[in-house]
C-alpha cells in the first residue's frame, strides 16, 4: 500500500494563496472555497476563484480543481476591474451548488451555480427583495460583505456584514432568509452579532463582530464563526436557532497565537497576524478550523491553514495553537527535510501581533506569483526566531539548515523558544543556498524545533533536516 503524504500547514503548495477558506465535505472529498490573493499583490483578492480538494482519508494530497469562476463572469464586472471577495457555497434544494460572493466595489450579493462542487460555475443572479430591489441597494440597507450561507430544507440562511471602528451605520452581522430559488428574500435582515459600535456592555465586548460571517450546524446547535474586532481572531457563537439568540463562545484560533499559554505567556504574540477568515468542518470523526495566515510582510498574500479542534460535550470549543501539522492527525515524522515556510511561529525579541515591521522575518518566495517555487523564511535579522511544531523525534543526532544571505552569525537550535540551546550552526556571507550541519542531542518524544538567528546582516532560511 502506498504511503500517504504527511499533511502540512499551510496545507496547499507554498506558491498558492487562497485565504478566507470555507471547507466542505462532498462525496468523500474536502473542498475549500476561498478568495484568491497574489504573491506581491497590492490589494486583497486579485485572482479568479479557484478550488482545491483532498480525499477525506488523505489530507496531505490536495488536487487543483482549476478556475471555477472568473471575475468577469458577473454581468456587473464584464471588464474584470473589480475583485472577487470571500465567497461561500451551499447545496440548494435542487442538489446544485450555489456560490455566493461580493465584488469589492458593490454593496450587493451575487450568486453563481454549478452541477458539481468544483466545475465551471455560471452566473445565476443577485440576492433581492420580493419587489426585485437588490439586497444592499434599498434605503437603509447595510452594504453586503463576506456572505455565509446554510441551506436547510427549502430555505437558505444568508449572513453578511462588515463593521469597522467608528462607523455606526454598520450594526453587525445580519441574517436574512432566502426562498428555494436561492435569490429571493422571504425574511428581511436582522442583526445577530453586534459590531464594535454596539458591543459595549454586552457579552460581545472585546470580541465584537468585524467580518467573515460563517455558519455551520452540529447536532442541534448552530455555530456562527466570525472575525472579531481585533482581526486576528476567529471566534464562535452558538444558538439553537439560525435566526438569532446567539451567545459568545470564545476564540477558536488567532493567527498570531495570542491568548495561548501552553508554550509561552498568553499575552505574547508568536506570529505576525492581521485579518482572519475561515470556518469549522467535520472530516471523518474529527473537527477542524480552517483559517489563514499572512506572508511576505503583507496584508495581501494570505495562505490557508487548518488546525484540529474538539467540540466538547457541552458544545464549547477551546482555542487551539498554531502548528505546522494541522491536518496531519498528529506530529510530523521527526526525521527528514522540512521547508522553512512551514514555520508556524515567527517573531523577534520584540514580538508584535501584526505584520508590517521592517525588521520582521516573513515567509517569501522567489519569482512572481504563480511560479511554482518553494517558499522560505526571509528578512531574518538578529533575534529572529522561526518555530516549527510538532515532530515525533526518535534518535536524532544531527541537524542541517539550508540558508543564504549577506549575514554572519549563528542559528541557535532549541525545542522550546526560551529553552536551552541544543546546537549552534554558524553561517557565512553567501548569495546562494548553502548547507550547515551540527551535531545535536534531543530526547526522544514530541517536540517543537525553534531556530533563532544571532548575528549581523539579513539572511534567508530555506529548510532544515533532522537525521
Set out the residue ranges of the language-model regions.
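Carbohydrate-active catalytic/glycan-binding domains of CAZyme proteins
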Residues: 1-424, 428-467
Amino acid at each position: 500500500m502506498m504511503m500517504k503524504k504527511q499533511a502540512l500547514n499551510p496545507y496547499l503548495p507554498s506558491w498558492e494563496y487562497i485565504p478566507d477558506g470555507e471547507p466542505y465535505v462532498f462525496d468523500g472529498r474536502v473542498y475549500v472555497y476561498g478568495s484568491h490573493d497574489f504573491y506581491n499583490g497590492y490589494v486583497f483578492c486579485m485572482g479568479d476563484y479557484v478550488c482545491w480538494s483532498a480525499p477525506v482519508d488523505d489530507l496531505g494530497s490536495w488536487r487543483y480543481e482549476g478556475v471555477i469562476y472568473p471575475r468577469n463572469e458577473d454581468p456587473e464586472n464584464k471588464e474584470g476591474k473589480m475583485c472577487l471577495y470571500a465567497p461561500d457555497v451551499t447545496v440548494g434544494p435542487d442538489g446544485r451548488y450555489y456560490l455566493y460572493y461580493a465584488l469589492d466595489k458593490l454593496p450587493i450579493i451575487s450568486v453563481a451555480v454549478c452541477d458539481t462542487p468544483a466545475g465551471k460555475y455560471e452566473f445565476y443572479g443577485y440576492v433581492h427583495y420580493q419587489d426585485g430591489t437588490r439586497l444592499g441597494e434599498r434605503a437603509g440597507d447595510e452594504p453586503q460583505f463576506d456572505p455565509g450561507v446554510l441551506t436547510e430544507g427549502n430555505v437558505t440562511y444568508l449572513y453578511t456584514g462588515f463593521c469597522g471602528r467608528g462607523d455606526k451605520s454598520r450594526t453587525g452581522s445580519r441574517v436574512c432568509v432566502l426562498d428555494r430559488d436561492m435569490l429571493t428574500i422571504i425574511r428581511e435582515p436582522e442583526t445577530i452579532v453586534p459590531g464594535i459600535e454596539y458591543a459595549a456592555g454586552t457579552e460581545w465586548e472585546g470580541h465584537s463582530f468585524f467580518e467573515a460571517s460563517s455558519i455551520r450546524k452540529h447536532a442541534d446547535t448552530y455555530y456562527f464563526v466570525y472575525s472579531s474586532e481585533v482581526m486576528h481572531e476567529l471566534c464562535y457563537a452558538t444558538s439553537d436557532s439560525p435566526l438569532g439568540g446567539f451567545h459568545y463562545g470564545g476564540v477558536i484560533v488567532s493567527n498570531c497565537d495570542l491568548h495561548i499559554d501552553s508554550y509561552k505567556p498568553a499575552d505574547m504574540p508568536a506570529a505576525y497576524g492581521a485579518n482572519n477568515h475561515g470556518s469549522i468542518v467535520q472530516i471523518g470523526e474529527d473537527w477542524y478550523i480552517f483559517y489563514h495566515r499572512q506572508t511576505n510582510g503583507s496584508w495581501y498574500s494570505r495562505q490557508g491553514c487548518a488546525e484540529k479542534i474538539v467540540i466538547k460535550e457541552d458544545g464549547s470549543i477551546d482555542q487551539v495553537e498554531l502548528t505546522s501539522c494541522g491536518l496531519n492527525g498528529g506530529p510530523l515524522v521527526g526525521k527528514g527535510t522540512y521547508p522553512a515556510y512551514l514555520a508556524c511561529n515567527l517573531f523577534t525579541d520584540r514580538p508584535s501581533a501584526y505584520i508590517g515591521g521592517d525588521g520582521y522575518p516573513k515567509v517569501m518566495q522567489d519569482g512572481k506569483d504563480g511560479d511554482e517555487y518553494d517558499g522560505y523564511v526571509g528578512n531574518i535579522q538578529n533575534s529572529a526566531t522561526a518555530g516549527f511544531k510538532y515532530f515525533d523525534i526518535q534518535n536524532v543526532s544531527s541537524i542541517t539548515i539550508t540558508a543564504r544571505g549577506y549575514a554572519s552569525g549563528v542559528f541557535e537550535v532549541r525545542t522550546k523558544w526560551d529553552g536551552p540551546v541544543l546546537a549552534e550552526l554558524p553561517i557565512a556571507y553567501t548569495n546562494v543556498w548553502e548547507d550547515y550541519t551540527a551535531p545535536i542531542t534531543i530526547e526522544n518524544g514530541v517536540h517543537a524545533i525553534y531556530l533563532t538567528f544571532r548575528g549581523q546582516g539579513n539572511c534567508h532560511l530555506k529548510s532544515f533536516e533532522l537525521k
